[in-house]
Amino acid sequence: MTAILERRESESLWGRFCNWITSSENRLYIGWFGVLMIPTLLTATSVFIIAFIAAPPVDIDGIREPVSGSLLYGNNIISGAIIPTSAAIGLHFYPIWEAASVDEWLYNGGPYELIVLHFLLGVACYMGREWELSFRLGMRPWIAVAYSAPVAAATAVFLIYPIGQGSFSDGMPLGISGTFNFMIVFQAEHNILMHPFHMLGVAGVFGGSLFSAMHGSLVTSSLIRETTENESANEGYRFGQEEETYNIVAAHGYFGRLIFQYASFNNSRSLHFFLAAWPVVGIWFTALGISTMAFNLNGFNFNQSVVDSQGRVINTWADIINRANLGMEVMHERNAHNFPLDLAAIEAPSTNG
C-alpha cells in the first residue's frame, strides 16, 4: 500500500496533465485532438468576428479593385462576408509575416486564408475528438464517421476547389450572400446541377430531412396507451415526458399499412443505420463531386443534343440551362476579363453573304 501511495505522489506534472486531458470524467472531454482543436477553432472564430466587423476591402481579383465585405465598410449581416484571399496571392501560404505590412496583408485578404486553414484543422480535430471519446468509453466509432461528411464538404469548398482552380480567391466567401454568389458562379463554370454526384447529394439532404421528419413524428405518435378507450390517449401523456412511450411494433404496423409491409423497419438498429447512412453517403458524394469539378471534370453537357432532319437545333432543357450559365458567367468578375472562358474559346461563326 505504501508503494502505491509513493508512486501517486511522485507522479510527474506531465503525467497528471495527460490523465486530465484524457479523462472522460471531465464535464467537457478534451482529449489529445482537443489540444489542437481548441486553439485552432478559437483563432478561426475570433479572427472571423473581427474581420466580419472591421476588415478593409480586399483586392479579390488581383486587379486593384478592392471589394468591401465588413460591416464597418457598408455591409449588413446578409451582404457581409470575409472576402477570399486575392488572386495575386494564388495558392501561396500567406501568413502575416509574409506581407510587408499588416495593411498589405489585409488588402490581399490574408484573414480568409488564416480563418479557413485554422477552421479546417479545427473541425478535423473535432472529428478525431469524437472518435477519441468513443474509444475511451468503449463505443463504436460511427459518430466520427458520420461527421466526416460535413468535414469533407467544408474541405472541398474551402481547400480542394481553390487548389484545383489555382487560387484561394476561388474559395467560398465566408458570408450569406457570398455563399450564394459562390453557388451561382460554380453553376456557371461547372454545370453542377447536371452532375450525378450533386444529384445524389440533393437526394441525401432532402431525403434525410424527409426521413428525419417521418421518424420523429412516428415516434412521437406511437404511444403506449395509459388511458381507457373512452378517453383521449393524450390524457396519459405529458409533452416531453422522460418516460418512454415509443412502441416500435405499433410504429411498424402503422407504417407497413400506410405504404406497404417492407417499406417499414421492424429492427431499431437497421432503422437508425439507414437514417444515418442516407444523408452521410449523399454528402460524401457531393464533396467528391466538388473535388472533381475543382479540376474541371464538370457536369453533363447535353447542349444542342437534339436536331431535326435539316440539322437545326431543337432546344431542350439543357440548352436553357446553358444559356443561363452563360448569363451568370458574363456577370461575375466582369472587370477581370472581357469574355467568359466559354465564349472566348470558340471560333467565330461563319456568315453567309
UniProtKB/Swiss-Prot annotation:
One Gene Ontology biological process:
response to herbicide
The source's superkingdom equals Eukaryota
- Sites binding chlorophyll a PD1 sit at H198
What does the UniProt record tell us about how this protein is modified after translation? Tyr-161 forms a radical intermediate that is referred to as redox-active TyrZ, YZ or Y-Z.
Reactions catalysed, as given in the entry: 2 a plastoquinone + 4 hnu + 2 H2O = 2 a plastoquinol + O2
Q: Which residues bind chlorophyll a ChlzD1?
A: H118
Pfam families for the chain: Photo_RC (PF00124)
Where exactly are the transmembrane stretches of this chain?
29-46, 118-133, 142-156, 197-218, 274-288
In-chain residues carrying the UniProt-annotated modification N-acetylthreonine: T2
Main localization is: plastid
Q: Where [CaMn4O5] cluster is bound, by residue? A: D170, E189, H332, E333, D342, A344
Localization per Swiss-Prot or TrEMBL? Plastid, Chloroplast thylakoid membrane
Disulfide cysteine pairs (residue numbers) = none
Q: Where is this site: Cleavage?
A: A344, A345
Q: Where is this site: Stabilizes free radical intermediate?
A: H190
The record describes its membrane topology as: Multi-pass membrane protein
This molecule's function is given as: Photosystem II (PSII) is a light-driven water:plastoquinone oxidoreductase that uses light energy to abstract electrons from H(2)O, generating O(2) and a proton gradient subsequently used for ATP formation. It consists of a core antenna complex that captures photons, and an electron transfer chain that converts photonic excitation into a charge separation. The D1/D2 (PsbA/PsbD) reaction center heterodimer binds P680, the primary electron donor of PSII as well as several subsequent electron acceptors.
- According to its UniProt record, which protein family does this protein belong to? Belongs to the reaction center PufL/M/PsbA/D family.
Extract the PANTHER family matched here. PHOTOSYSTEM II D2 PROTEIN, PHOTOSYSTEM II PROTEIN D1
What subunit structure does UniProt give?
PSII is composed of 1 copy each of membrane proteins PsbA, PsbB, PsbC, PsbD, PsbE, PsbF, PsbH, PsbI, PsbJ, PsbK, PsbL, PsbM, PsbT, PsbX, PsbY, PsbZ, Psb30/Ycf12, at least 3 peripheral proteins of the oxygen-evolving complex and a large number of cofactors. It forms dimeric complexes.
Task: State the protein's name.
Answer: Photosystem II protein D1
